[in-house]
């Protein structure tokens, strides 16, 4: 792993004792080389001694910069968790640094700053007496590519900086002593195996342009998975100064890559030249941005605002952040370090040392909350999670997963007939993933139903791939509970906790199945299936607000989790299940569980209406494999037809056709608000890892990739203020 320091750039092959210009010295320690420091006899400098097994080489280093390099090496040696890519980038930026003599830092500075500047600045020369910088003699000899090759690095200058129009990028590697102190009961960030702590500051081309600084940290080992192509901590926020969106792209700390993007800020709206806009979410803004409206703390991932303009920022701006999985562990409060002062709105270049800059306090980012922000950033795309069931004892697997890089936790590979197929989704769960870990990824989506959103989660895949286990599981065993019972437990726990904040909820549950293109009520006491000669009397209707109603369907008011659990148990006994050659207990129908919320805040008279749809689709299967005959053959044909209609709908939405054939089947017509409305929709694609099912798995993954590309519109919250007549 490379370590950043300072030595002669032309030291390779240089004579011992040769003095190189200060601006041409770098320190590179690669591989297993060890660093030693020996003071010069005259006390004017030091020599770096590097051993590589075959001998040693001495490199001259300036005495004034020695403490900084010692602290850097000491710090980086203790931070073995840092990604090689991050360190390589840091070393590269240090080589491109403007030549200057570093001041005397403390003996062990808490943070090492690695900076870079453009080559244009290197062409300017100033006297050392007036500026404190060393004169840059013969700047043409400063050949960066040669320095990189001598350093053992073979990389190009990042094109990202030119694309972003940025002049300076600073990468701060925070030392453990200066890192945010974890709240009680939180796992130390240093114990995380994949997520180091880092800080990325992006500064614009001009002094009056905008900058952003975001501190990041990991609180739990399980919560550092990459999301949405290097957007693990990419935050789209609303400014507290004015209602202006500011995009702050940051480093993906799981893989170390830094996707720098354009930093946009609408000056026409604010009327201010913000130099620093490292804000993210205030509590009141988070309600509309992330869908959390039921009291504080709202899920504010980073709360820090700084501006070069005096009087722009309130002095006590602060907010709290919470993690839905470990609320006690990562809930914290981060006030700004220092308040804003009133003053003139002059150009920062003319303000000089008198310019007031509000300091940014320590910010503690919960990765779980960052995932919620990434979830809201998708502009209405259907989220797709992939889950692979475990292998049975007599099966051989054909599924692999990336072990590193940007697709870690998001990619899946299948080999079929000697050809490899690779797919990426928002999340991929391996065979060993537990039910609890799966639910954690969708818990925020379930929570948003209480805030007045329409939420739909459905499972898709071939028969025997684990759809019913994912959605329902075994409610009798805690570790095997599926998404439906876990979602209900969370909803009732949250609704009870919100009573103290003035919220009261009314909940109604219903459950139906679509069997052979006919709707059956699973909560009816005299349940009669189509195979017993019963006739379907239920019809689907959609109102003007996009809500779905099924005529004559039994809707039960539920007051506790026990009541809902008994309803689920009764519905499971009524569902159509059959045995095929591919599955001993194959679901022969599409099952839809619906929970409606009606909430009122007695203090603010605010009303919300939310809907949670949890759907377990029947599995697709090939007739030659299932061996279906008689009723099973008819069921298989009906299942495949409805899933084919679902595929037609998805293709029409993806192509943005004017007509979408929702009415071609009962399933697609029932899902119309979820697929073509303002709902938050998530699809699970379940796979069987065995070799014999690879063909069906590839078909499912292709369909899931098409679903993931569909834009169904931005989710809309159903809320209003209660009138006096209603009260």
From Swiss-Prot:
CDD domains to which the protein is assigned, alphabetical: KISc_C_terminal
Pfam families to which the protein is assigned, alphabetical: Kinesin
Binding-site residues for ATP, renumbered to this chain: 461-468
Stretches with biased composition (Polar residues): 114-133
The entry's keywords: ATP-binding, Microtubule, Motor protein, Nucleotide-binding
Signal peptide extent: none
GO molecular function terms attached to this record: ATP binding; ATP hydrolysis activity; microtubule binding; microtubule motor activity
Classification via SUPFAM superfamilies: P-loop containing nucleoside triphosphate hydrolases (SSF52540)
One Gene Ontology cellular component: microtubule
Record-linked InterPro entries: Kinesin-like_fam, Kinesin_motor_CS, Kinesin_motor_dom, Kinesin_motor_dom_sf, P-loop_NTPase
Region named Disordered: 100-156, 172-194, 336-357
Similarity section: Belongs to the TRAFAC class myosin-kinesin ATPase superfamily. Kinesin family. KIN-14 subfamily.
Protein name: Kinesin-like protein KIN-14G
The organism of origin for this protein: Oryza sativa subsp. japonica (Rice)
Gene assigned in the entry: KIN14G
